[in-house]
Amino acid sequence: MASGARYAGKVVVVTGAARGIGAGIARAFVDSGAQVVICDKDERGGRALEQELRGAVFIRCDVTREEDVRALLSDTVHRFGRLDCVVNNAGSHPPLQPLEETTAQGFRELLELNLLGTYTLCKLAFPHLRRSRGNIINISTLVGAVGQLQGVPYAATKGAVTALTKALALDESQYGVRVNCISPGNIWTPLWQELAALAPDPRAAIREGAMAQPLGRMGQPAEVGAAAVFLASEASFCTGLELFVTGGAELGSGPENFFRSLGLCVVPEDVPPPTSRPRICSYK
């Protein structure tokens, strides 16, 4: 089936869609023929993407505000007459820090965005999705399953998103609504760049991120977008699924360890582009 017809005539809401993974997902659904609602607090970024993507509209929404979420869904159904898919992508990754340096208030705020925002949109969208026998795709993360050094609040909130996905999949199966999640690994996005800039050595942080995957590079937002379109369309017998889009990082054997076992190294002064494989030299 041609990519432009895979989800033709369907209506998709993508939160946190103004940039990064969310923008990649929005682009992929537009390419598949869907009508896409770009949802974000960032009006400038959302409007810019709306101008870029034919078949997309921007609606400003803060997913931590239930009244905003209600308005988002009401406006979407009023404009398009239906709702077929919701992608809960809005979220944040705070800077890494030891647990003793975190605060309960900061944790609560992260829960409001990463978990309760997803919960609220799911709850309010289900009446529409039951009518269309649609589906929800929640964006979790690899570290929700394997943990993250000095990233306890983030890993905890995203791990809860995965658990929420599985529980909702059971509840909604009686209505023919599927609920799945995607757990990305290192995806090269503006957020990744911002977090790397906070590291003592940003170039080394980027290199380490790229080398964490057996495929030897970071992923791209378009690759997460392709996974989302697959879950919404062809994956009609999948529900409660956690789909890892990680370059194999969860296997625990990135190329740096492999090259070392062969007596090779990544050229230390060379930081490869995050989405391409690095140059290799000999230790000898």
Swiss-Prot record:
Reactions mediated catalytically: L-fucose + NAD(+) = L-fucono-1,5-lactone + NADH + H(+); D-arabinose + NAD(+) = D-arabinono-1,5-lactone + NADH + H(+); L-galactose + NAD(+) = L-galactono-1,5-lactone + NADH + H(+)
Cellular component, GO annotation: cytosol
Domain of life, source organism: Eukaryota
Gene Ontology terms: biological process: L-fucose catabolic process; steroid catabolic process
pH dependence, entry free text: Optimum pH is 8.5 to 10.0.
Keywords: Carbohydrate metabolism, Fucose metabolism, NAD, Oxidoreductase
EC number(s) on file: 1.1.1.122
InterPro entries named among the record's database cross-references: NAD(P)-bd_dom_sf, SDR_fam
Single GO MF annotation: estradiol 17-beta-dehydrogenase [NAD(P)+] activity
The keyword Oxidoreductase is assigned to this record: yes
Gene3D superfamilies per UniProt: NAD(P)-binding Rossmann-like Domain
Pathway(s) the chain acts in: Carbohydrate degradation; L-fucose degradation
Binding residue positions for NAD(+): R19, I21, D40, K41, D62, V63, N89, Y154, K158, I187, T189, L191
Protein family (similarity comment): Belongs to the short-chain dehydrogenases/reductases (SDR) family.
Function statement: Catalyzes the NAD(+)-dependent oxidation of L-fucose, yielding L-fucono-1,5-lactone, which rapidly converts spontaneously to L-fucone-1,4-lactone. Can also act on D-arabinose and L-galactose, with lower catalytic efficiency. Does not use NADPH. May be the initial enzyme of the putative L-fucose degradation pathway in mammals.
NCBIfam families: PRK07231.1
Protein name in UniProt: L-fucose dehydrogenase
Lineage: Eukaryota, Metazoa, Chordata, Craniata, Vertebrata
